[in-house]
Amino acid sequence: DGDAVLFSDEAEKIFQAHGLEAFAASEKAAAREPLSGGPFIGFLSALHQIQSLFPAEDSPIRTALITARSAPAHERVIRTLRAWNIRIDEALFLGGLDKGRFLKSFGADIYFDDQAGHCMSASEHVATGHVLHGVANEG
């Protein structure tokens, strides 16, 4: 997942406090500003370093970002990954669709998310880790 996992939860806080419309407007306005790193940025960076030792088509590791975001909020994510100089193999912007089916289709080995509901759906298809970070886990 992206927000509160790979990225900080700054955008998720806006969504939780003010709703989808405010989130979309905020992300569109900040599209050229990279997001701050979240708790798994180091893990993704390490995977990227391993991947960079191999040609893309021969890498033993494939990475995917599967997020509830959709256009226009995808632009900030893409620009952030470019600013970090991190390549991912797949990016799925699901616009709120259930993540479990997509994880199954992708053939993921493991998935990390900050929201318990997304973890429940994903865990039916793939080993799943609940990242206890961010506004979705407060309280």
Describe the predicted segments one by one.
Residues 3-93:
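Alpha-helical substrate-recognition element adjacent to the catalytic core
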